[in-house]
């Protein structure tokens, strides 16, 4: 395995890179997106600045190496999410010089060693109940990162949705056969779709919000958040009739501040839109 030392890996889109500087070879397996690993940080990180991280520090007084345990899909900061991606390119016993290049061009540098893979189950070998637990974990990580790191939250929600969607139609799942019933899986899937809608609203991708909240039209009692986000997307798309109809799916919407404010905005914009249309028509035929 001498040839492996010096091997380089790079993900230009994410600004990630690593170069192998040492190897105590044990096996060629690499961590998966659901693995649990033990790794060491061998020296202080450079150019970390004030960026939060559970694993990397730039403290001169810290002692090294620092050993950590990490379950993939649980990182709650941008730096640590990237650290997960880097570790997924390691083999056990590998030491590598790693870097994360930020949008401003700063290069955060650090040295990692993958001590061992504690748990390395392949996703395709998981049962429906196990997939549910992984998706739930990813969803919870997404919720925890949404306010501070929305793009990473979006990634967590997408990963969770992709895991669950393989079991559609959910009503085929039973507790006896699959370890979990379809209703529980569908409820989690709808929660994730609602969370995706929040991310997409931030990015002004309103058509995608409509797509991910289609269930609002068919569910007997869709959540308040899902109704509001769908109505807000219709409002921004200037589909005011649909926005108003969506709001009316919410019982006693008049008593809810956000809904009441959105309804008023819809009414004003709808009126202005009709007045503008009338003015355009008059100009055309005057």
UniProtKB/Swiss-Prot annotation:
Q: How does it sit in the membrane?
A: Peripheral membrane protein
| Record bears the keyword Transferase | no
Instruction: Briefly explain the null phenotype.
Output: Lethal. RNAi-mediated knockdown in the wing disrupts cell polarity. RNAi-mediated knockdown in clock cells, results in behavioral arrhythmicity and long periods. RNAi-mediated knockdown in the eye disrupts oscillations in the subcellular localizations of per and dco, leading to constitutively nuclear per and constitutively cytosolic dco in photoreceptor cells.
Write out the GO biological process terms.
locomotor rhythm; regulation of establishment of planar polarity; regulation of intracellular protein transport; regulation of post-translational protein modification; regulation of protein catabolic process
- According to the record, the segments passing through the membrane are none
Could you tell me the superkingdom of the organism this chain comes from?
Eukaryota
Q: Where in the cell is it found?
A: Cytoplasm, Cytosol; Cell membrane
Alphabetical UniProt keywords = Cell membrane, Cytoplasm, Developmental protein, Membrane
What GO CC terms are in its UniProt record? cytosol; plasma membrane
Q: What is its main location?
A: cytoplasm
- Signal peptide start and end residues: none
Any one GO MF term held by the record is: kinase activator activity
Keyword Cell membrane tagged: yes
Report the Pfam families cross-referenced here: Bdbt-like_TPR (PF21603), FKBP_N_2 (PF18023)
What subunit structure does UniProt give? Interacts with dco (via nuclear localization signal). Interacts with Ankrd49; interaction promotes the stability of both complex members.
This molecule's function is given as: Functions in planar polarity establishment and circadian rhythms by promoting the activity and localization of dco/dbt. Required for regulating the levels of dco/dbt and per in the nuclei of photoreceptor cells and thereby is involved in normal oscillations of the circadian clock proteins in the eye. In the dark, the cry circadian and rhodopsin visual pathways, activate the accumulation of the protein into Arr1- and Arr2-dependent cytosolic foci which are required for dco localization to photoreceptor nuclei.
Record's protein name? Protein Bride of doubletime
Organism this protein belongs to: Drosophila melanogaster
Report which gene this protein is encoded by: Bdbt
């Amino acid at each position: 395995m001498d040839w492996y030392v010096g091997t380089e890996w790079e993900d230009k889109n994410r600004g990630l890179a690593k170069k192998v500087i040492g190897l105590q070879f044990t096996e060629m397996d690499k961590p998966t997106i659901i693995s649990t690993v033990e790794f060491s940080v061998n020296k202080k990180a450079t150019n970390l600045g004030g960026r939060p991280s559970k694993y990397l520090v730039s403290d001169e007084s810290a002692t090294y190496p620092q050993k950590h345990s990490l379950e993939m899909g649980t990182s709650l900061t941008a730096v640590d999410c990237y650290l997960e991606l880097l570790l997924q390119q390691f083999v056990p016993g590998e030491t590598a010089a790693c870097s994360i290049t930020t949008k401003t061009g700063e290069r955060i540098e650090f040295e990692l060693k993958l001590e061992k893979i504690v748990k390395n189950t392949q996703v395709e070998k998981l049962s429906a109940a196990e997939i549910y637990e992984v998706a739930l974990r990813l969803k919870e990580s997404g919720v925890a990162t949404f306010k501070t790191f929305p793009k990473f939250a979006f990634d967590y929600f997408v990963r969770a949705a992709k895991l669950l969607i393989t079991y559609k139609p959910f009503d085929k799942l039973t507790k006896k056969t699959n370890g979990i019933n379809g209703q529980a899986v569908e409820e989690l899937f709808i929660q994730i779709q609602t969370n995706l809608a929040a991310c997409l609203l931030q990015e002004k991708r309103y058509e995608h919000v409509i797509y991910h909240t289609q269930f609002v039209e068919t569910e007997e009692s869709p959540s308040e958040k899902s109704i509001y986000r769908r109505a807000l997307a219709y409002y921004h798309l200037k589909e005011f009739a649909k926005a108003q109809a969506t709001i009316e799916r919410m019982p006693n919407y008049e008593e809810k501040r956000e809904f009441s404010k959105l309804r008023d905005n819809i009414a004003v914009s709808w009126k202005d839109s009709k007045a503008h249309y009338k003015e355009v028509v008059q100009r055309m035929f005057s």
